[in-house]
């Protein structure tokens, strides 16, 4: 399956917030282990896809073969896409909650998990929107397997952390986000990070086009607030 991932979603661009243990576990696995399994969960927009993209990017830069399977887009492919993935250095399965109750997909993931265990040479990262035991899977053995490894909740960011995350993204794109503007965005917009990042990108383009710095009046005019 072809792999197209955002080139700006790396560990360097991820604001950790209250998630140092998860970040440390991921980086230890990627940098020092040849195998292992980590499951982490959060609500939608909590940053789990970003971390999977970051993991793929880190190993790809080292020349390792990786696989990323976004199950929210499973209609684009079939369960057989998982065949042979145990030969990769890293397999990332995103949004596993999307296949709960889908027996062919559940069986395909269960079989892949077992093949990865047997190979002993593949790292496996799986994300969901809830803990493994709450996924309402039809296959009890898969639920049991998912509960075996390291399990983390990806903690949501506080408002202060969201401001820091926005300012980090701005710096990585080559501009500054003043604190008052950032707090204005948090006050007036949906606080889900995906929405905030898309809005920040929109403001970046608008400020370049208008050759103006980001100020609250400029943001109000641009966003119609």
UniProtKB/Swiss-Prot annotation:
InterPro entries named among the record's database cross-references: Chromosome_initiator_DnaA-like (IPR020591), DnaA_dom (IPR013317), Hda (IPR017788), Hda_Enterobact (IPR022864), Hda_lid (IPR055199), P-loop_NTPase (IPR027417)
One Pfam family here: Hda_lid
Keywords: DNA replication, DNA replication inhibitor
Signal peptide per UniProt: none
Biological process terms in GO annotation: DNA replication initiation; negative regulation of DNA-templated DNA replication initiation
Subunit-level organization: The active form seems to be an ADP-bound monomer. Forms the RIDA complex (regulatory inactivation of DnaA) of ATP-DnaA, ADP-Hda and the DNA-loaded beta sliding clamp (dnaN).
PANTHER family: CHROMOSOMAL REPLICATION INITIATOR PROTEIN DNAA, DNAA REGULATORY INACTIVATOR HDA
Family, similarity comment: Belongs to the DnaA family. HdA subfamily.
UniProt name for this protein: DnaA regulatory inactivator Hda
Species assigned in the record: Cronobacter sakazakii (strain ATCC BAA-894) (Enterobacter sakazakii)
């Amino acid at each position: 399956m072809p792999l197209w991932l955002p080139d700006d979603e790396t560990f360097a661009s991820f604001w950790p917030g209250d998630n140092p243990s998860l970040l440390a576990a991921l980086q230890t696995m990627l940098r020092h282990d040849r195998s292992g399994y980590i499951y982490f969960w959060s609500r939608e927009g909590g940053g789990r896809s970003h971390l999977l993209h970051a993991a793929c990017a880190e190993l790809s830069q080292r020349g390792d073969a990786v696989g990323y399977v976004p199950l929210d887009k499973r209609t684009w492919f079939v369960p057989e896409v998982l065949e042979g993935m145990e030969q990769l250095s890293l397999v990332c399965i995103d949004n596993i909650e999307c296949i709960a109750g889908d027996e062919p997909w559940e069986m395909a993931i269960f079989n892949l998990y077992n093949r990865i265990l047997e190979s002993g040479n593949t790292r496996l990262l799986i994300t969901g929107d809830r803990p493994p035991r709450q996924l309402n899977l039809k296959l009890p053995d898969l639920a049991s397997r998912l509960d075996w490894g390291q399990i983390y909740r990806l903690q949501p960011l506080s408002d202060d952390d969201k401001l820091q995350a926005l300012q980090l993204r701005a710096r990585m794109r080559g501009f500054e986000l003043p604190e008052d503007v950032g707090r204005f965005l948090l006050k007036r917009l949906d606080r889900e990070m995906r929405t905030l990042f898309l809005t920040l990108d929109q403001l970046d383009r608008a400020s370049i086009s208008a050759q103006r710095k980001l100020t609250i009046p400029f943001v109000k005019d641009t966003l119609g607030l």
